């Protein structure tokens, strides 16, 4: 019962966040300087892909933040060269309250956000929508309201992801 109420509260907060995202001015970007990647645990091992993506746009590794979303209670910590934060459903409070310990992270503004997941789930969408990003890129099977650019490809196809994002994002920048 508590999980159902928590899910309902998170769904309401997600709705508020989606409204906020849709009303944001997108403005003209000339260059991306910061990158946020929100991914499921199954895609968290793609550090090389994320670094290659950032390199295409001249984003320094120090300006990359990865958020890994998991259903597990206990997460294995993996040492990476990219700033990485792990979230579980327990990280989010009962009424969809985000962790106080990561308040600064949620206040930070990102130039580009990649929603590197291809499914629709309230927890994933809520965390993704909680960040302040100028431009959001995602995949076709997730909530389209989350993203400004939607790629109809499989996230497991790394080379295709690099090619497609390079094509479309460079067109947006020019």
Residue map of PLM features:
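Active-site and donor-binding regions of nucleotide-sugar-utilizing enzymes
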Residues: 91-155
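Short N-terminal or domain-adjacent regulatory/targeting segments
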Residues: 2-34, 41-44
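Active-site-proximal region of nucleotide-activated glycan assembly enzymes
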Residues: 144-174
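Histidine-anchored nucleotide/phosphate-binding helix
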Residues: 38, 42-59
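Structural motif
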Residues: 38-42, 69-70, 116-118
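Short, charged/polar "capping" segments at the starts of alpha-helices
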Residues: 44-46, 72-77, 146
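Structural beta-sheet core signal
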Residues: 37, 66-68, 138
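Conserved nucleotide-cofactor-binding alpha/beta core module
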Residues: 58-102
């Amino acid at each position: 019962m508590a999980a159902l109420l928590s899910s309902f509260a998170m769904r309401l907060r997600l709705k508020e966040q989606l409204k906020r995202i849709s009303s944001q001015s997108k403005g003209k970007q000339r260059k991306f300087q910061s990158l946020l990647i929100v991914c499921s645990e199954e895609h968290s091992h793609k550090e090389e892909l994320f670094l290659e993506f950032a390199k295409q746009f001249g984003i320094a590794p120090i300006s990359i933040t990865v958020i890994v979303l998991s259903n597990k209670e206990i997460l294995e910590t993996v040492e990476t060269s990219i700033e990485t934060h792990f979230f579980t459903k327990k990280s989010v409070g009962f009424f969809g309250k985000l962790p106080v310990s990561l308040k600064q992270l949620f206040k930070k503004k990102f130039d580009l956000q990649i929603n590197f997941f291809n499914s629709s789930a309230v927890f994933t969408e809520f965390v993704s929508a909680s960040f302040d990003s100028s431009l959001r890129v995602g995949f076709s099977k997730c909530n389209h309201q989350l993203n400004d650019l939607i790629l109809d490809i499989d996230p497991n196809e790394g080379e295709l992801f690099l090619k497609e994002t390079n094509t479309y994002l460079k067109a947006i920048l020019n």
